[in-house]
Curated annotation (Swiss-Prot):
Domain of life per record: Archaea
Full protein name: Protein GrpE
Annotated PROSITE patterns: GRPE (PS01071)
GO molecular-function term, one example from the UniProt record: protein homodimerization activity
UniProt feature, compositional bias: Basic and acidic residues: 1-16, 34-44
Segments of this protein annotated with the region Disordered: 1-61
Keyword Methyltransferase: no
GO biological process annotation, one example: protein folding
Gene for this chain: grpE
The UniProt record lists the keyword Chaperone: yes
GO cellular component: cytoplasm
Keywords for this protein: Chaperone, Cytoplasm, Stress response
Similarity-based family: Belongs to the GrpE family.
Length: 209
């Protein structure tokens, strides 16, 4: 009788342990992880998640930046042109002012010469004064790059520096020889601004004789 009671007690104890194990299993939930398999970790948030720009937005932003730079460059260039124009105008006025001041000196000398001529008894002094004024005047022209073109009688005619206003038929001098100079020519910084006006010899055609 005692043995039966002991067996029942042991059986009851095993059932209690089994129920306790089942209860623990229910709490922890079914496990699907296989042996040797690592538990999957939650995906890490991508750096800058939510702030990354789309290609279209990046292009628009870059376009706006380039447009702003272009507008700034255009404004700077416009200001540069205005400054350059002002500087050129100031330089032009300064040069013109200096030229006029130089010729004012000649005007002063002309006035003094006229006063002296009214009381002068010697015409030679008047002529000498006029010659000095002519030299002073031309020296001012030379100061600004003006030169008289070389042109002499019996010299050779140069169509680039001389203008023939008359042809004189003669056999006394070679063809295209300058016979007379009517008006001197001038060049400014080696550029002809007025050719010398001359008459040129032209030898008669032998067939016309």
């Amino acid at each position: 009788m005692k043995k039966s009671t002991k067996k029942e007690s042991t059986h009851s104890k095993e059932e209690s342990q089994t129920q306790a194990g089942n209860s623990e299993a229910r709490k922890s939930g079914p496990s699907t992880k296989k042996a040797g398999e690592k538990t999957a970790e939650p995906e890490k948030a991508t750096a800058g998640s939510g702030t990354e720009k789309s290609p279209e937005a990046a292009c628009r932003e870059e376009n706006e930046l380039l447009k702003d730079q272009l507008f700034r460059l255009a404004a700077d260039f416009d200001n540069f042109k205005k400054r350059t124009a002002r500087q050129m105008e100031e330089n032009r006025k300064a040069v013109l002012e200096q030229v006029l001041l130089d010729f004012v000196e000649v005007t002063d000398n002309f006035e003094r010469a006229l006063k002296s001529a009214q009381t002068a008894e010697d015409m030679g002094s008047i002529v000498s004064g006029i010659e000095q004024l002519s030299k002073q005047f031309f020296s001012i022209l030379q100061k600004y790059g003006l030169e008289r073109i070389k042109c002499e009688k019996a010299g050779e005619f140069d169509p680039h520096r001389h203008e023939a206003v008359q042809h004189i038929e003669t056999s006394e001098v070679p063809d295209n020889t300058i016979v007379d100079v009517y008006k001197p020519g001038y060049s400014l910084n080696e550029k002809v601004i007025r050719p010398a006006l001359v008459s040129v010899a032209r030898n008669p055609d032998e067939t016309e004789k």
